[in-house]
Amino acid sequence: MMITDKIKELKEKCPYKTALVDIKTKNKITFSQMDIRSDKICTYFEKKGLKKGDKIVIFIPIGVEFYLILTAILKMGMQAVFIDPYADTEYINKCCETVSPEGIVGSGKTILKGFFLKGIRKIRKKINYVKMLEQAEGLPPM
């Protein structure tokens, strides 16, 4: 059973039970919200041309948003790629060259910095996660 299946199961059993809590921000999300919001992120990814099998770099802080995005990536059958945001430029470039991801999800600052990093610059689909989350709210679940 995949984690995404377990989330759907828990959404049915206890939709209003807290699924995640971000200790730093006190942000909480229920199983129902997690399933629905991650489905909307899937719709956003599909509109951006991302599909099953694509490799996506996740370059955002760990928190509720991170897990929503990761859940959407897994639901779509894409591959999540994690790169240490504190790594040096050479390491980041090498990771991107080795993996050849189709997309990157990061902050606006990360996307901007990416124009100066060869490895990130080569990634075709650059997604600002804050804007994505805002826009995804208005989309239908997949």
Outline where the language-model segments fall.
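AMP-dependent adenylate-forming
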Residues: 7-29
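Hydrophobic alpha-helical segments typical of transmembrane helices
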Residues: 6-7, 91
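Conserved hydrophobic/aromatic "anchor" residues
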Residues: 29-31, 70
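Structural core segment of the AMP-binding/adenylate-forming
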Residues: 75-142
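Conserved AMP-binding/adenylate-forming
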Residues: 43-87
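Short amphipathic alpha-helical/adjacent loop interface patches that line ligand
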Residues: 38, 42
